[in-house]
A protein has these predicted regions:
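Extreme N-terminal basic, low-complexity initiation segments
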Residues: 2-12
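N-terminal amphipathic/hydrophobic targeting modules at extreme N-termini
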Residues: 2, 17-22, 26-31, 37-38
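Phosphate/pyrophosphate- and phosphate-bearing ligand-binding catalytic cores of soluble enzymes
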Residues: 56-57, 62-66, 108, 199-358, ...
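Short, Lys/Arg-enriched N-terminal segments with co-localized hydrophobic residues
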Residues: 38-52
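Anion-binding (especially nucleotide phosphate/pyrophosphate-binding) glycine-rich loop
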Residues: 54-195
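Short hydrophobic targeting helices and cationic amphipathic motifs
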Residues: 9, 30-31, 41-42
Length: 386
C-alpha cells in the first residue's frame, strides 16, 4: 500500500514540477530530485514528442525551400498544435541545437547541410473572430488567407496577393508589396517561448515592425515558435492603385474602379508575369530589400540618372528599387556558374540547376559590390541566409 501511495504522490509531484517549469518557476533544463520515505526520485524535464508529429533524422530540406537547394538537417520536427509545439521545445536537448524555425521556405537560402534541428509548423487553420478580425495558424498558406479575406469582403490584404509562404512568416518578415505591409494588418501574434514552453501573446507594437523587419527577425530570432497570427481587416474598401504598374495594368483591361476581386487578379497576373515559378526555376522571390536613402542622396543620383524610379517615404527619405540598380549594373539575365539573375526581374536571383547555397551567396556578394561601386549604396538580402 505504501508503494502505491508513494507512486501516486510521485505522479502528483511530477505534475507540480512540470507546471512550475512551464510557468517559469523552475529551470526547464535542470533535473529535480525528490526524497520520499528516504528514497531519491529523479524527475527529468524531458518529454517525448507526440506520436502523431513528424520527427525525422537526416532529413532532406529540398521540399521545404523554394530555391531548390538539396541540403539536409540533422533532425526535422513538424508540430500541428500549440500543445505539440510546447512538447517539442520541452523535449529539446543540448545536442538538438542549433535551431532553425522554418515556414514555407520561400524566403530562405540554405548555404549547406544544417547541423541542428529544423522546426516546422503544421498548424493550419483560419478562423473568423468577428469584428473584421481573422486568426490563422502559423502554417496556413498566406495567399489562402488573402483569398479568404477578399471572398468575405474583408479588405486591406488584396495588394499582398500571391506572396508565397505561410502566415507565421508574415509576422517575422513583415512581408509587403504594392504599397501594403503585413504590419498594417497584424493585431496579435501568439507564440511558444522555446526556453520555457510558455504561450505568449504579442501586440503589434511589441513586435517593433519596420520595412521587412521585426523583433522576431532579430532580438527574438529562434526564441519563439509562432503558432498563430490575428489580423484586423476592414469592411471599408479603399483600393491602393498608385504603386508599381497597377493603374497601367487596370487601364489595359478597361477598369477604372476595380473591385477587390479584380485588383487581386491584376496583382496576381503582374507578379506571375515578372516572377519565376519556383516549381520550374528555383528562387525566393525578391532577394534584396529596396534601400531607403536620404533625400540628398536621392537628389544626387537623380541628377546623374534621368528618370530614376523612386518612392517617397517621408520628407527626408526616398526608396530606390534595388532591381533597377542591379539592372543598371548589367546583371539582368546574367549568371555566375549555376546561379543567375532572372531575365524578367533583376531583383530575383535564381537557381539555374544544381546551384549550391554558396553559389547564390557568391552571386549576391558580387552584385552587392557592383551596386556599391556604381551608386554608393549598400543593398542587403531580404532572404534569410542560413
Amino acid at each position: 500500500m505504501a508503494f502505491r501511495e508513494d507512486k501516486c504522490l510521485l505522479i502528483v509531484i511530477e505534475s507540480i514540477v512540470w507546471v512550475m517549469k512551464v510557468c517559469g518557476k523552475a529551470n526547464p533544463h535542470h533535473p529535480i530530485f525528490i526524497n520520499i520515505r528516504g528514497n531519491n526520485h529523479f524527475i527529468p524535464f524531458t518529454h517525448k514528442v507526440s506520436s502523431d508529429m513528424k520527427d525525422l533524422k537526416s532529413y532532406s530540406l529540398l521540399p521545404h525551400n523554394t530555391f531548390g537547394i538539396d541540403a539536409k538537417c540533422r533532425r526535422f520536427v513538424e508540430y500541428n498544435t500549440v500543445e505539440e509545439a510546447q512538447d517539442v521545445v520541452r523535449s529539446l536537448k543540448d545536442d538538438d541545437y542549433p535551431l532553425l524555425i522554418l515556414g514555407g521556405g520561400s524566403n530562405l537560402l540554405l548555404t549547406g547541410d544544417y547541423a541542428g534541428t529544423v522546426l516546422h509548423s503544421g498548424i493550419s487553420f483560419i478562423e473568423d473572430l468577428g469584428n473584421e478580425r481573422v486568426r490563422c495558424g502559423s502554417g496556413y498558406v498566406w495567399d489562402d488567407f488573402v483569398d479568404y479575406c477578399v471572398r468575405h469582403n474583408l479588405y486591406g490584404a488584396e495588394n499582398l496577393s500571391i506572396i508565397p509562404g505561410e502566415c507565421g512568416a508574415s509576422a517575422v518578415q513583415n512581408i509587403g508589396a504594392y504599397g501594403a505591409e503585413a504590419k498594417d494588418l497584424i493585431e496579435e501574434v501568439e507564440a511558444v517561448e522555446i526556453a520555457t514552453g510558455k504561450v505568449c501573446h504579442f501586440a503589434n507594437a511589441d513586435c517593433e515592425y519596420s520595412y521587412r523587419q521585426s523583433k522576431f527577425k532579430h532580438e527574438w530570432r529562434d526564441k519563439f515558435l509562432i503558432t498563430s497570427v490575428t489580423y484586423k481587416l476592414s469592411k471599408t474598401y479603399e483600393p491602393r492603385l498608385d504603386y508599381g504598374n497597377i493603374r497601367a495594368a487596370l487601364a489595359e483591361r478597361g477598369i477604372d474602379n476595380p473591385t477587390a476581386t479584380e485588383l487581386r487578379q491584376v496583382i496576381t497576373d503582374i507578379r506571375n508575369a515578372k516572377l519565376p515559378d519556383p516549381k520550374r526555376i528555383g528562387n525566393a522571390g525578391s532577394f534584396f530589400m529596396n534601400p531607403i536613402v536620404s533625400k540628398d542622396k536621392y537628389l544626387e543620383l537623380a541628377a546623374q540618372y534621368e528618370g530614376m524610379p523612386h518612392y517617397t517615404i517621408d520628407d527626408d527619405h526616398e526608396k530606390i528599387p534595388a532591381g533597377w540598380m542591379i539592372d543598371q549594373c548589367g546583371w539582368r539575365g546574367k549568371a555566375l556558374g549555376n546561379a543567375g539573375v532572372y531575365e524578367k526581374q533583376a531583383l530575383v536571383l535564381v537557381n539555374l540547376g544544381g546551384a549550391t547555397g554558396s553559389d547564390v551567396v557568391h552571386l549576391c556578394e558580387t552584385i552587392q559590390h557592383d551596386v556599391k561601386e556604381k551608386f554608393g549604396i549598400e543593398i542587403h538580402p531580404e532572404v534569410n541566409v542560413r
